[in-house]
Amino acid sequence: MLKRTPLFHAYETFGAKTIDFGGWELPVQFSSIKEEHEAVRTKAGLFDVSHMGEVEIKGQDALPFLQRLLTNDVSKLTDGKALYTAMCYEDGGTVDDLLVYQKEKNDYLLVINASNIEKDVEWLLQHQGENDVLIQNVSDEIALLALQGPLAADIMKDVADEEVTSLKPFTFLSKAEVAQKEVLVSRTGYTGEDGFEIYCQSEDAVHIWSALLKVGAPKGLIPCGLGARDTLRFEARLPLYGQELTKDISPLEGGIGFAVKTDKEANFIGKEALKKQKEEGPKRKLVGIEMIDKGIPRTDYPVFSGEKQIGVVTTGTQSPTLKKNVGLALIESSQAQLGTVVEVQVRKKRLKAKIVATPFYKRAK
């Protein structure tokens, strides 16, 4: 039996096409991936991402505990600020990538990937030791909506006060009102656009979803599915766990070295391995590839230089914004220079591609 979010029945109203996504029955699209993608790039889109996991970390030792588990420097956070980070194994492989929210001193919220909820919670509990921390998986109580796009703030102002719309990127309010319901709202997202993520009680999700679509529709807001979420995050070079980051791919290889602070005092799990990787330079690198020959690079397609396989495509598609066939590939660092011509094995053919700069899309500030 597939799991469903509190918004499942609202999908049907909009004719959503659902798929099995890591054990969840979720909408891959409502109208079309292309239309939803373009709405987020030019106007706004509303996503149900309630399948994501939320874990509360509270107690006297919350900070030292998180400093030991996470690669970024949590001590830099202040109340109302959020931080993107990774959690690693001793060998530098990635357990997960996540957001950490500091509500107040000794009170944090971790937002983790849906497919990793059980594994992550187990990992946290396994390392609790003597620390005075309470680790609570609250994923089932919380629904999560993402309002994304250049008109997100304009739409939000119709259902929330100025305190919400004036939030800076990576800041949040832990007790705000959106559509008369109490929520935690942050200026964050996974699309490469401006936007908000709204954490609400599961029973309030349908009300907030409907209220946002009601005020947003005249401005071009449409509901969006996982298909567009994937093409949007891909163009902005935001990694997806299981593709750009895995237990075998470190944050440095997966292109999120900025979230790894090997110079922080805390001796976090994976620090030695990642320090060594940083000093020697990772042996593999995440690069952009653009097809020269006709074909689309897809996840797990091998990448060759001559007869030698030098890596693999992690994500690829026809970019709706660029109208080009592009991909992200994890390849040997020695072959990663811009402009290098490589070959991608597309079914039985080897097709030419070149290494290009990423992100494929960056919004104008």
From Swiss-Prot:
Coiled coil: none annotated. It is an enzyme of class 2 (transferase). GO terms for cellular component: cytosol; glycine cleavage complex. The keyword Transferase applies. Its EC number is 2.1.2.10. It catalyses: N(6)-[(R)-S(8)-aminomethyldihydrolipoyl]-L-lysyl-[protein] + (6S)-5,6,7,8-tetrahydrofolate = N(6)-[(R)-dihydrolipoyl]-L-lysyl-[protein] + (6R)-5,10-methylene-5,6,7,8-tetrahydrofolate + NH4(+). GO terms for molecular function: aminomethyltransferase activity; transaminase activity. GO terms for biological process: glycine decarboxylation via glycine cleavage system. Pfam families: GCV_T, GCV_T_C. InterPro entries: GCS_T, GCS_T_bac, GCST_C, GCV_T_N, GcvT/YgfZ/DmdA, GcvT/YgfZ_C, TrmE/GcvT_dom1. The keyword Zinc does not apply. Keywords: Aminotransferase, Transferase. The glycine cleavage system is composed of four proteins: P, T, L and H. The glycine cleavage system catalyzes the degradation of glycine. Belongs to the GcvT family. This is Aminomethyltransferase. It comes from Bacillus pumilus (strain SAFR-032). The lineage of its organism: Bacteria, Bacillati, Bacillota, Bacilli, Bacillales.
